[in-house]
């Protein structure tokens, strides 16, 4: 279908795509650099907190169990992406593909049970093991 609309070599099409993508990115960065508000005395090494200076310097490491939950979400979200790809090719994969998918799900369920028993999913106030 692509040859009907634009008879072009696939390598040239890739080069055009990369060049246009890089040009769009450069244009967006250039427009942002021109239009941004320039402030005298702005410190680029301080975090942005709604336009005000930070209240106090950090007092040490922060307890942030959210990052653990986010990492677990990313790990187990990949399971869904892989299983969606398997579902598309389930007929061609046959019984072997079904068994492989079941083993994959089983390993991830074992990992989830291990994390649950280990207390990695307990992120409220309370005792951890």
From Swiss-Prot:
The chain crosses the membrane at residues 14-34, 67-87, 97-117. It is a multi-pass membrane protein. Its main location: membrane. Keywords: Cell inner membrane, Cell membrane, Membrane, NAD, Quinone, Translocase, Transmembrane, Transmembrane helix, Transport, Ubiquinone. Its EC number is 7.1.1.-. It catalyses: a quinone + NADH + 5 H(+)(in) = a quinol + NAD(+) + 4 H(+)(out). GO terms for cellular component: NADH dehydrogenase complex; plasma membrane. The keyword Cell membrane applies. GO terms for molecular function: NADH dehydrogenase (ubiquinone) activity; NADH:ubiquinone reductase (non-electrogenic) activity; quinone binding. It holds the Pfam family Oxidored_q4. NDH-1 is composed of 14 different subunits. Subunits NuoA, H, J, K, L, M, N constitute the membrane sector of the complex. HAMAP family: NDH1_NuoA (MF_01394). This is NADH-quinone oxidoreductase subunit A.
């Amino acid at each position: 279908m692509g040859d009907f609309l634009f008879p072009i070599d696939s390598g040239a099409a890739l080069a055009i795509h990369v060049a246009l993508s890089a040009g769009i990115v450069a244009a967006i960065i250039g427009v942002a650099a021109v239009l941004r508000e320039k402030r005298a005395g702005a410190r680029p090494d301080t975090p942005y907190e709604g336009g005000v200076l930070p209240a106090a310097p950090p007092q040490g490491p922060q307890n942030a169990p959210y990052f653990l939950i986010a990492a677990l979400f990313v790990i187990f979200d990949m399971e869904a992406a892989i299983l969606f790809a398997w579902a598309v090719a389930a007929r061609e994969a046959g019984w072997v593909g079904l068994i492989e998918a079941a083993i994959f799900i089983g390993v991830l369920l074992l990992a989830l049970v291990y994390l649950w028993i280990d207390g990695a999913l307990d992120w409220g106030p309370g005792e951890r093991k």
